[in-house]
Regions:
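Cysteine-centered motifs
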Residues: 2-3, 13
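Selected alpha-helical membrane-embedding segments in polytopic membrane proteins
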Residues: 25-126
Length: 214
């Protein structure tokens, strides 16, 4: 590693570490805040400018990688041909494609959910602003995405159920703080959004499967 050598390479490594460590530390602090102090976290998020690029680089892609990587490691290490998402046996030759599908589905689901937020926002007196909607879709999904790291063992799928409950709670807070959805309409807004997401996911999945893509 360049970090344990002397000279220019060590200096370059120190510079890179100095650039990326503060961002990583901020991201980790935000994740912990969403899990432990969600109200405070959403207050901070609501005040921040919406940056699609930042959300993709710091949260969506890195966190979406956790579940497929853990799943592939678990399947390869323990030879347990299992799928935490669907519960069916996965053939050895399909393990990597299953991981890639999980990654693709996780990322696309976040962007689609944000689009659904934007689509139905006017029904609840909220403005259509995709970056803000993506903030809610991304930060709300953090518990489920982080829990994906535990899927190296099949039994840990139970943790995902707990994470899903916390994700629903984060959405319940976030749509009010960031999207200005009326307090009394939050449950309905989230319910409709997730129902639409589930329906679209099923349709897209069936279409891709029939086309032989997955």
């Amino acid at each position: 590693s360049c970090c344990v050598t002397a000279g220019p390479r060590a200096s370059a490594c120190a510079v890179v570490g100095g650039l990326y460590w503060p961002a990583m530390r901020y991201t980790l602090r935000r994740i912990l805040s969403l899990i432990l102090t969600p109200n405070q976290a959403w207050d901070e998020i609501a005040r921040e400018p919406a940056s699609v690029d930042l959300l993709i680089r710091r949260y969506i892609v890195p966190l979406a990688l956790l579940a497929p990587v853990a799943t592939v490691i678990g399947m390869e290490t323990f030879d347990g041909r299992w799928s935490p998402a669907h519960g069916y046996l996965v053939p050895q030759e399909a393990i990597w494609s299953a991981g890639a599908t999980t990654l693709f589905a996780s990322i696309i689901s976040i962007f689609v959910l944000a689009g659904i937020f934007v689509l139905i926002a006017p029904m609840y007196g909220s403005s259509r602003h995709y970056p803000s909607a993506l903030k809610v879709a991304t930060y709300g999904a953090v518990p489920v995405l982080v829990a994906g790291a535990l899927l190296i063992l099949p039994v840990m799928v139970m943790i995902s159920v707990v994470a899903l409950c916390h994700t629903l709670y984060l959405y319940w807070i976030g749509v009010r703080r960031v999207l200005d959805v009326p307090e009394e309409a939050r449950t309905e807004f989230i319910g409709i959004s997730l129902t639409m997401l589930g329906g679209l996911s099923s349709i897209i999945g069936a279409a891709l499967s029939s086309a032989g893509l997955f």
